[in-house]
Amino acid sequence: NFKLYKGAEKVFYNINSIIGYKECVITEGEMDVLALHEAGIKNAISVPNGATLNSNNLDYLDNCIDYFEDKEKIILAVDNDEPGQALQQELIRRLGAEVCFLATFEECKDANDYLIKYGKEALAQRIIKSRPVPLENVTTFKDIEDEITDFVKNGFKRGYQIGIPNFDNI
């Protein structure tokens, strides 16, 4: 039975569970926290009121910021929808990209859906295999792996012809 009382200070659901851990998981709903508990991940918390596109009101983060000072890794496991992605970007901005990691749930909406479809071991692996926030303006091998493979197999693509045989054959 989850309730929000009018005028009450908003805090993360299950916030005390991250005390003493160097990492934590932030979800978008209480049921996602319970799904992670089922998968053996106890240091999971949830934003108190989900994510909305119209509001970036993260007062609850300001109220709880001290809980994150000692965290070396913060895994963001938000919903795979537009409001969830907006929440993710705002959390990255406020908490710092250097400590944030991203968990994805393939075609599933969230951690709870993933648990129902694939089971608790698969959900735990999704969290364990979370990836760092991609750096802006940095290209990694994974980003261009397909292009490199094509080049190795096929070489340079033929350039434009200008109509002068000595140049066209280069």
Question: Each predicted region: which residue ranges?
Answer:
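Residues at the starts of beta-strands that form the adenosine-phosphate
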Residues: N43, K73, V99
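Short acidic (Asp/Glu) and glycine-rich catalytic loops that position anionic groups and cofactors
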Residues: E69-E72, E145-D146
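The Walker A/P-loop phosphate-binding site
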Residues: E136-I170
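Phosphate-handling DNA/RNA-contact segment within nucleic-acid enzymes
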Residues: N1-D70, Q88
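Short, acidic/turn-prone active-site loops that include or flank metal/cofactor-
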Residues: V47-L53, N80, T104-E107
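Short beta->alpha junction loops/turns
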Residues: G29, N80-D81
